[in-house]
A protein has these predicted regions:
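Active-site-proximal beta-strand elements of phosphoester/diester hydrolases
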Residues: 4-24, 52, 116, 129, ...
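Active-site catalytic loop in hydrolytic enzyme cores
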Residues: 106-195, 205-215
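Conserved hydrophobic/aromatic positions in well-ordered beta-strands
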Residues: 8, 118-120, 247, 267
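Cys-nucleophile CN-hydrolase/nitrilase-fold catalytic domain and related Cys-dependent amidase chemistry
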Residues: 25-28, 35-132, 137-138, 203-215, ...
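Short, acidic/polar
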Residues: 30-40, 181-188
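Acidic/histidine-rich helix-loop elements
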Residues: 15-29, 76, 141-151
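CN hydrolase (nitrilase-like) catalytic-core segments centered on the catalytic cysteine
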Residues: 79-99, 171-270, 278, 287
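C-terminal beta-strand edge segments of enzyme domains
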Residues: 215, 229-343
Length: 343
């Protein structure tokens, strides 16, 4: 039986890189502050077994400043890499799991950029990486989705890499970015066995992720954390454009810890995986056992919305490329009657 244990969201202020020359200095500042927050919560916050950081907590959202894909890549990190190696030492020191997210480059995929969330184990290893699926399709980012070159990606890593879940002494852990606003993202992790989903988020309308998290947790009978970012520092955008409002939700959709602040903050709550497993074994209104995949599946297969393998030859270079695709998708959905054109 797994005893209940504390989990923490470290809502760090995040300094943004504004040009490639600043990369080393800014990431060092963000990383050092992150280490301080870990030490603080381990000393005064109940010694959590898992700590989570926001998306982009090392570099900031570099879409604010990057002029092209080359600058994006110059301001990104490798995972594993120098920065995660430092975090790994802290994970070993305290015997904890650390989750966070950042823009990533990978030598295996030249020219590509990923928005990646990761988990580091108490042994100091990167044991999970989840590369955001719904990123190119947002028409807001030029990070690659695994879906952009899906066939090649799955051939290299297997389908499990799309929804990575790790089996640990603390239960089965999944990790997600702001991608959790799509219900399929969280459900995909749950279908792979996830019981505790570590959400690393940054932007959005205030309270948006909190409300989404309550629904995602309830409908998937899973614990879910939303670690928002504190204030945005060193950027031309307002400091309060971050999400803040970090939240921890239980498997019934009940908020068990939260902060209503946009400033730096730490929240902690207890996770009871054994009780979750009992809840998932109930015979009445079991949200997972009741899923009718045979009925819902064909609807997705016939939808013909966002296409896979669109950028399998060359990584996306500009959001204008994605805008062309979204117009094609909308036209198909209008013609099928899925959507109705506005008057």
């Amino acid at each position: 039986m797994i005893e209940s244990y504390p989990i923490a969201c470290l809502q760090a202020n995040v300094r943004y890189i504004m040009n490639p020359a600043q990369k080393k200095e800014v990431i060092s500042q963000n990383l050092n502050r992150g280490l301080e927050l870990i030490d603080s919560v381990m000393r005064w916050g109940g010694r959590p077994k898992i700590v989570t950081f926001p998306e982009f907590f090392l570099s900031g959202f570099i879409g604010v400043s990057a002029k092209n894909i080359d600058e994006y890549r110059q301001m990104s990190i490798q995972i594993p890499g120098d920065e995660t190696d430092v975090l790994a030492k802290k994970a070993v020191e305290h015997g904890i799991y650390i989750a966070g997210g950042n823009y990533e480059v990978d030598d295996d995929w030249p020219g590509r950029l990923f928005l990646t969330v990761f988990v580091i184990s108490p042994e100091g290893k990167v044991v999970a990486k989840n590369r955001t699926l719904n990123v190119t399709s947002s028409t807001f980012s030029i990070a690659s989705s695994p879906g952009d070159f899906l066939s090649e990606y799955v051939a290299k890593y297997g389908e499990d890499a799309l929804f990575p879940v790790i089996d640990t002494p603390l239960g089965k852990l999944g990790v997600a970015s702001g991608d959790m606003i799509w219900p399929e993202t969280v459900r995909g992790l749950v279908f792979k066995g996830a019981e505790v989903i570590l959400g690393c988020c940054t932007g959005g309308v205030r309270f948006m992720f909190r409300e989404i998290a309550k629904v995602r947790a309830m409908e998937n009978m899973a614990y879910l954390t939303v670690c928002g970012a504190g204030r945005i520092l060193g950027s031309p955008v307002p400091e309060t454009w971050s999400s803040g409002d970090s939240t921890i939700v239980d498997y019934k959709g009940k908020v068990i810890a939260q902060t209503e602040s946009l400033d730096e903050a730490i929240i902690v709550a207890d996770i009871d995986v054994n009780q979750l497993r009992k809840e998932r074994s109930r015979t009445a209104n079991n949200m997972l056992a009741m899923i009718r995949g045979d009925i819902y599946g064909p609807l997705y297969q016939k939808l013909e919305a966002w296409p896979s393998n669109r950028w399998n030859q060359k990584p996306i270079q500009s959001t204008e490329e994605a805008k062309v695709v979204i117009k094609e998708v909308l036209e198909r959905l209008y013609n099928k009657g899925t959507l109705t054109r506005p008057s």
